[in-house]
Amino acid sequence: LITIVSEPHTDLWQRTYYGFSNDNAPVLQMKTSNKFFSFTVKTSFNSSALFDQCGIAIYLDSDNWMKASIEYENEEYQRLGSVVTNNGYSDWATHDIPSSIKEMWYRLSRRGSDYYIETSPDGTTFHQMRTFHLDKGDGEISFGIYAASPVDHSFTAQFSEMEVGECKWQPWSAEDTGFKQTASKRLRVYTLHNSKKAVTAD
């Protein structure tokens, strides 16, 4: 069991939309050159202030990293989501869940420089959160756990049931679904008389 008490005014974010850069959230990490593995951890937390967050992270440098966590919003809902930062710009993908949820499992899987995040409310059934790529994530990486409080607040996060093992993200092929690759087709856009557009490929 690892306990982290977050420090006020800590966060990870780079530039996009808000314009600022925050790079001071504590991340407890381990290093690996293994290109095929999965990392699983359970988080428990008592967050109660705006943007309180804890979860998993890959931190390569200030401009290249990812995090997945629950960020507290208010007494009704919080945001389960992920941030991927490549070359100094962050994105943020979320969906709302009840604020009564105070535990979450995360599973991070790696295949080369591509990564896959899953979450689970019970540690048994995992659901896809995101598939993503890190531009500088093909070599040795540092990954682990973090907690942060962007506002003037602090909370306690606990991390347990940590496991690093074989990659649980199975490779996918077009034959699995009968999907045929059509990347070589050229896209053409025609402007119609009513200003609507029809799109065809040949």
Ranges and model annotations:
Residues 1-187, 193-200:
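Extracellular glycan-recognition regions
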